[in-house]
Amino acid sequence: MMSPTPEDDRDLVVVRGRLRMMDNGAEHDRERRSYTAWPHLCCGCTIGIILTMFVIATTLLLASLFAFSYMSLESGTCPKEWIGLGYSCMRVAGNNATELEALDMCAQHNSKLIDFTNAKTLVEAIVPFGSTNASFGNIFRLRDSRSTCILPTIGGPISVDCPRTCSVVCQRPRPLSTTASIIRDARIYLRLERRDYYEVYSSILSNAIMK
């Protein structure tokens, strides 16, 4: 067997050098890929965390809209010149008013005529401090009936036929807090609730408390 010639040794050195360069290039490529993979991985984790937080927040928001009773967030404070009674606020809007005038007076205050239960409770509260003479015009016109009104007496309120003109007492729900108003507006916007739901619900609660 022939021994390698000097030319063969030179060729071997060249080949080894090329192989070493190829190994260095491959290692450099691996390092470069590892360096570029970290930013992508961190970005993906950040996006995943943000999406998870968004889903959780959306779920909590929808749950509050469907299940939360915003009635517990009412401010409990009636506006100036209004009297609080149960879940309602009431105000004497005028005297000697016809039925149409009474409806218009309450509409101007974004309210409606007082209902029978609230009128009865209000009369029982004010009779000891005021006149019980019907000539003073303190016959209340009611929302529930166009022909029956309430007359305060010492023995308590009684139902009477409505004269042409009566006193006007308006009522509306107690105002909600800012948070409760936002929840209510969102429910109405999403058509999860009718606009008059709070008024009807507060009236039912007031009647239940006063019975």
Swiss-Prot record:
Q: Which residues are glycosylated?
A: N96, N133
Q: What's the domain of life for this entry? A: Viruses
Its annotated compartments are: Virion membrane
Instruction: State a single Pfam family of this protein.
Output: UL45
UniProt cross-references to InterPro entries, sorted A to Z: CTDL_fold
Q: Which GO terms describe its cellular component?
A: membrane; viral envelope; virion membrane
Under the heading SUPFAM superfamilies, the entry gives:
C-type lectin-like (SSF56436)
Q: Which cysteines share a disulfide bond?
A: none
Q: How does it sit in the membrane?
A: Single-pass type II membrane protein
* Family under the similarity heading: Belongs to the herpesviridae HHV-1 UL45 family.
Please report the name of this protein according to its UniProt entry: Envelope protein UL45 homolog
Gene (UniProt): UL45H
